[in-house]
Amino acid sequence: MARVKFGKVTRARRKRWIKRAKGYYGTKHSSYKKAHEQVVRSMAYAFIGRKQKKRDFRKLWIVRINAAVRPYGLSYSKFMNGLKLANIDVNRKMLSELAISNPEQFKLLVDASNKALTSK
């Protein structure tokens, strides 16, 4: 009787790794060993990327807010300090969206920030 090198359980497990490597270049999408190595590496990059995405978006919002308050003679840090003094608790994402889509409402926040800074 011939020796069974791997059965259906092993085949299914290997097939799962190959399926995850769909679309990869070269032997990385067909060879089990290469596919497994690449998928593990890809998952590590994806994990890191999910953390970086949060940083990148925060940076983007800060740049947008800074660009929006400069015409009013304020810097980003002074503007945020003024909002804090005025007890206005709006997150950076919303401030960025307001600056782009609704400049007149954003101007009201800038005025409130200025007022809080001058009355300090």
From Swiss-Prot:
<protein>
    <recommendedName>
        <fullName>Large ribosomal subunit protein bL20</fullName>
    </recommendedName>
</protein>
<keyword id="KW-0687">Ribonucleoprotein</keyword>
<keyword id="KW-0689">Ribosomal protein</keyword>
<dbReference type="InterPro" id="IPR049946">
    <property type="entry name" value="RIBOSOMAL_L20_CS"/>
</dbReference>
<comment type="similarity">
    <text>Belongs to the bacterial ribosomal protein bL20 family.</text>
</comment>
<dbReference type="GO" id="GO:0005840">
    <property type="term" value="C:ribosome"/>
</dbReference>
<keyword id="KW-0694">RNA-binding</keyword>
<dbReference type="InterPro" id="IPR005813">
    <property type="entry name" value="Ribosomal_bL20"/>
</dbReference>
<dbReference type="GO" id="GO:1990904">
    <property type="term" value="C:ribonucleoprotein complex"/>
</dbReference>
<comment type="function">
    <text>Binds directly to 23S ribosomal RNA and is necessary for the in vitro assembly process of the 50S ribosomal subunit. It is not involved in the protein synthesizing functions of that subunit.</text>
</comment>
<dbReference type="GO" id="GO:0019843">
    <property type="term" value="F:rRNA binding"/>
</dbReference>
<dbReference type="GO" id="GO:0006412">
    <property type="term" value="P:translation"/>
</dbReference>
<dbReference type="InterPro" id="IPR035566">
    <property type="entry name" value="Ribosomal_protein_bL20_C"/>
</dbReference>
<dbReference type="GO" id="GO:0000027">
    <property type="term" value="P:ribosomal large subunit assembly"/>
</dbReference>
<dbReference type="GO" id="GO:0003735">
    <property type="term" value="F:structural constituent of ribosome"/>
</dbReference>
<keyword id="KW-0699">rRNA-binding</keyword>
<dbReference type="Pfam" id="PF00453">
    <property type="entry name" value="Ribosomal_L20"/>
</dbReference>
